[in-house]
Amino acid sequence: AVALDPRLGYYAFEYDPRFVATGIDLAPLAMPLGKAQEPFVFTDLPELTYKRLPALLADALPDDFGNSLIDTWMASKGVAKSAITPLDRLAYMGKRGMGALEFRPTRGPNIASQTAIKLAKLVESARQAVHGEIDTEHHTKAALAQIIQVGTSAGGARAKATIAWNP
């Protein structure tokens, strides 16, 4: 679990005792299971890079393209960019991140459904998002939701999507 420590202003990470029992050491140098009795907090990491998170979690944050999609989505829901926390961004990554980690909020809906996509429409919607042309019309909102579903995790300087193909 991870939560903001109000005293320090940094996010504290604590292993669930059931996970500790598995013996899987996610970050053996920085957050070893042998020291899992107390929450881990890293106030010495550069805030700009790590967003006040442990490195293990900061590595899973979306890239600039993914962040712009999340910002646009949240704005359509009336949430200002300044109100979006790193935990919100991790929650939006869900199971779509590159790597083994998955994230979910402790409260709220847990939506996990697979849908077919139209690649040509997805590419056009991604172009619109990159150029800041996403508007608030229904079809564009649906396209944005689909881009967020497949495109917030691949990382890198260019927009891309991670999709499964089953002919």
Question: Could you say what each language-model-derived stretch is?
Answer:
Residues 1-167:
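Phosphate/dinucleotide-binding and metal-coordinating scaffold of catalytic cores
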